[in-house]
Amino acid sequence: MAAAIVVAFSLGALLPTAFGRSKAPTAVRTALARSQNVQGAPGRTMVLSKVVVEPGAQLALHHHLGTQISRIAAGTLTYTARKGFAVLHSGDAEKDPKFVRHIEAGQTAPIHPGQWLVEQPSDNHEAANRGSKPVVIYLATLLKTGAPPATPVSKP
């Protein structure tokens, strides 16, 4: 069974719970599959993950220590590039992928279901779910073996 871990939380908005207390909305990453020492990429691990971002959750500024492809399955993710750029695509990835745009440093863009981002290790970014329904993201990441799925970055 894949372990689910909390990967980010909001520092601001709080949601009421059934017990009268409040909790910060979260994003939960579940590793679905993994392969170490991928052919042609020794010392790397390929990871397939699912992330569910609750309404109001903010993903802190971070980067990945390898190339990552993120496809939005449900909800709308608000994505902000802080360093480098992400490449946004849409459509059928195998038959008819369409380039949508680059999201350059300092730009924010909504990412909708059926769209996907390609991020490189040099790209720092943050994201949020500003909607009322969960955002579901499927990720394929080629990381250095032993590297965390995301590495926090200090804001300037």
Give the residues covered by each predicted segment:
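A short glycine-rich, His/Asp/Glu-containing loop-to-beta-strand
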Residues: 25-60, 66-67, 73, 81, ...
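Short, small/polar residue-rich loop motifs at catalytic or cofactor-binding pockets
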Residues: 64-65, 104
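Short beta-strand His + acidic residue motifs that chelate non-heme Fe in jelly-roll/DSBH
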Residues: 61, 79, 107-108, 119, ...
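Short acidic-glycine-tyrosine-enriched beta hairpin
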Residues: 51-55, 83-123
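Double-stranded beta-helix
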Residues: 21-39, 44-45, 124-156
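Bacterial Sec-dependent signal peptides at the C-terminal "C-region" and cleavage site
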Residues: 11-25
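Soluble periplasmic/extracytoplasmic beta-strand elements of cell-envelope proteins
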Residues: 71, 78, 118, 138-141
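Bacterial N-terminal signal peptides
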Residues: 2-13
